[in-house]
Swiss-Prot record:
It comes from the Eukaryota. It comes from Arabidopsis thaliana. GO terms for cellular component: cytoplasm; nuclear microtubule. It holds the Pfam family QWRF. Residues 1-89, 115-144, 184-293 are annotated as: Disordered. A motif (QWRF motif) lies at residues 334-337. Residues 79-89 have a biased composition (Basic and acidic residues). Residues 1-26, 43-55, 65-78, 202-211, 244-262 have a biased composition (Polar residues). GO terms for molecular function: microtubule binding. One of its GO terms (biological process) is spindle assembly. The gene is QWRF9. Belongs to the QWRF family. InterPro entries: QWRF (IPR007573). This is QWRF motif-containing protein 9.
Length: 513
């Protein structure tokens, strides 16, 4: 906002001409006007005009008038809080307040003209000179918004009239009575009056008009605003409805009017904020609507044409920023989609490779197990071959032992049978009687058999000794063979070493040659 840098000192010298309020008044001089900064830009209350005590006062000004001998200029950043007393306001004044409030909300915009800013950057208090006593009075709007409490969106701002507790004095009550009579007689309030009141209280560049109530042209287009007020029932707690109709609009202005700022807005006051009609207003304080219209319309400022250009420039910048933001958001979504797809592909490839590695590890483990089993089988076969070779060497001796064993078994079986037969035939109990000759013959036969056995045993003893000697000789031969094998092993080692030496010597000889 380039217009916000205009110094307040220059704005304080700007004077606006106002016509005399009554021809019969003794003090009809042109009063000095002084403006304060707007609540929408500098964080201070909206401006107001100085006038004589008998002049019509704006219904928006709700601060009580406190006389003071010396007018002090207060800084803009230090708003004053004054004591307020509850006063009653008539229905016409409430309608006027609501209409001004709705016009503020409907004609608000994001850019303001330099003229309006110059008028809003002045001090927040002004001195009013009285015609009778020559005293000065300070007026200040009761509705001041701190900077921290301002809404973020200008289209959602609304003027708070909760502090309208001051009973309007002088000709202001006449204006309220005239507006009430015009509403009762079903006569619509003129556009000049409503527009001038709106400009007197807020002077918003996007919705302000000239002294005749016509909107200034924005790039060659004429905008006509028609404000219609509908008086609701008393039970609606002060609800008022204002609709703005446009006949010739540019595309951007049509979009701005089609937005919530330009459509018809119904606002209501809570029961605690409901205003009460004034009491004790005399008929002599009334004023004709024509004089109110003339006094209010001649103080409306003229707005330059480049305000709309600044507004459109800011709007274009906002549209460009929004478009850039959408492009960046779409690009971010594209990158997120690409990253998600890449992550999905990478995860699938990772799972596939892990599966392949697991299968390879499993096949390698199976091969290792099979190789180990083959090695075990090979060792078992080697042991079996060694055992077979040893048994083949001892098979001849085992066959000879089998023949000898058969002969011994036959002789032992014959001796056992003979002894059995001889013992069973002898009666030895129960008074047995034996034949001595037969017993003698039996004993003799047994002795003969034993002698035969002894002779056979004697024949076998040398054979057994011979076999034992052969076995001992076999052991000696085996031990000798083992010694010879050791010697052969040593000889083979020596031969291999000598062969290596011979090969090295031959290579050296070949190198020397």
């Amino acid at each position: 906002m380039t217009a916000a840098t205009i110094s307040p000192s220059f704005n304080a010298n700007v004077k606006q001409n106002k016509p005399p309020s009554f021809p019969s008044e003794s003090s009809n001089r042109r009063p000095k006007t002084r403006d304060v900064a707007s609540r929408y830009l500098g964080g201070t209350s909206s401006f107001f005009h100085q006038s004589s005590p008998k002049r019509c006062q704006s219904p928006i000004v709700t601060r009580p008038v406190t006389p003071s001998s010396v007018a002090t200029n207060r800084p803009q950043s230090t708003p004053r809080r004054e004591s307020l007393d509850r006063r009653e306001v008539s229905k016409a004044e409430r309608m006027l307040l609501t209409s001004g409030r709705s016009l503020f909300a409907s004609f608000q915009a994001d850019s303001f003209t330099p003229g309006t800013l110059e008028r809003r950057k002045t001090t927040s208090s002004a001195t009013i000179s009285k015609s009778g006593g020559g005293k000065q009075e300070k007026l200040k709007l009761s509705d001041q918004w701190p900077r921290s409490l301002q809404p973020s969106c200008l289209s959602s701002r609304s003027v708070d009239f909760t502090d309208t507790r001051k009973k309007l004095i002088g000709s202001g009550n006449g204006v309220a009575r005239a507006l009430q009579d015009s509403m009762v007689s079903n006569r619509p309030v003129s556009r000049e009056r409503i527009t001038s009141v709106d400009l007197e209280t807020e002077s918003v560049s996007s919705g302000s008009s000239n002294g005749r109530g016509k909107m200034l042209p924005a790039r060659g287009n004429v905008v006509k605003a028609r404000v219609s007020q509908d008086r609701l029932e008393p039970s609606s707690h002060g609800l008022r409805k204002i609709s703005v109709d446009s006949s010739v609009l540019s595309p951007k202005e049509a979009n701005s009017l089609s937005s919530p700022r330009g459509t018809s807005i119904a606002r209501g006051l809570s029961p605690s904020r409901e205003v009460v009609p004034p009491r004790g207003v005399s008929p002599s304080d009334r004023m004709s609507p024509l004089r109110v219209r003339s006094s209010l319309s001649k103080n409306t400022p003229l707005i330059p044409h480049f305000a709309v250009d600044g507004k459109e420039k800011i709007r274009d910048n906002g549209v460009a920023d929004a478009h850039l933001l959408r492009l960046l958001h779409s690009r971010l979504l594209q990158w997120q989609f690409a990253n998600a797809r890449a992550n999905a592909v990478i995860s699938s490839q990772k799972m596939r490779e892990e599966r392949r590695l697991y299968n390879a590890w499993r096949s390698i483990s199976n091969l290792y197990n099979s190789v180990s089993m083959k090695r075990i089988e090979m060792q078992h076969l080697k042991q079996n071959l060694k055992l077979i070779s040893i048994l083949n060497m001892q098979m001849g001796h085992l066959e000879e032992w089998l023949v000898i064993d058969r002969n011994y078994m036959g002789s032992l079986v014959g001796a056992a049978e003979a002894l059995k037969g001889s013992t069973l035939c002898l009666p030895v109990d129960c008074g047995a009687m034996v034949n001595v000759q037969s017993v003698k013959d039996a004993i003799c036969s047994a002795v003969d058999v034993m002698q035969a056995m002894a002779s056979s045993i004697c024949l076998l003893l040398p054979k057994v000794g011979k076999i034992s000697s052969l076995a001992a000789e076999l052991g000696r031969v085996n031990a000798k063979d083992e010694g010879m094998l050791d010697v052969c092993r040593d000889l083979l080692n020596t031969i291999s070493a000598l062969q290596v030496t011979e090969c090295s010597l031959r290579t050296q000889v070949t190198q020397l040659q």
